[in-house]
Regions:
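Charged DNA-binding/catalytic regions of mobile-element recombinases
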Residues: 1-181
Length: 181
């Protein structure tokens, strides 16, 4: 019958979920307990994007829950695993990391990668991860980005990457050293 009327059937193809190296999941050890008794006990990390006239600049941060300071940050034009690893390495150079440091993240591909697993293990960092689709589990990392964008980024039109890097670096210095928490 279909041939007689030149009709074609629509065949839906099965969609495959591709699995690459992004396979590590960690328990939610932080469990929304956003207070720490001492520095370098609980850290939260995340990535956000900053819009510039040249394109997006990605900002990766690590925030200490003891005093809400930004322990380390890195920026890049790409949202990559390398950006996250470089941020952790910067934190390692700056702070004394003990085996008790808990680093909490969302379930982004950077944080489930083999490279992230290897680096956190080599530094003695205990990874913790938000539940899937639950941004409140990593609220204090998200909160910093909200503060940054409200107090700094949305007040100016960024002409390019260099200007964004400068403004963000100056703001983080202000945030850590002068802003009342």
């Amino acid at each position: 019958v279909m041939q007689k009327y030149n009709l074609l059937s629509v065949v839906r193809r099965k969609k495959f979920k591709y699995v690459s190296e992004h396979l590590h999941k960690y328990p939610n050890l932080l469990n929304r307990e956003f207070e720490a008794e001492r520095p370098n006990q609980k850290w939260v990390t995340d990535i956000s994007y900053i819009k510039t006239a040249q394109g997006f600049l990605y900002l990766s941060i690590i925030r200490d829950l003891y005093d809400n300071s930004i322990v380390a940050y890195k920026m890049d034009k790409e949202q990559s695993i390398k950006l996250v690893l470089d941020t952790i390495k910067a934190a390692k150079r700056k702070e004394k990391i003990t085996a008790e440091v808990q680093l909490h993240s969302d379930q982004g591909f950077q944080y489930t990668s083999q490279a992230y697993f290897n680096l956190t293990q080599s530094y003695g960092i205990t990874p913790s991860m938000s539940r899937r689709g639950n941004p409140y589990d990593n609220a204090l990392a998200e909160n910093f980005f909200s503060i940054l964008k409200t107090e700094c980024i949305h007040r100016v039109k960024l002409s390019g990457y260099d200007e964004a890097r400068l403004i963000i670096s100056e703001y983080i210095n202000f945030y850590n050293n002068y802003r009342i928490q």
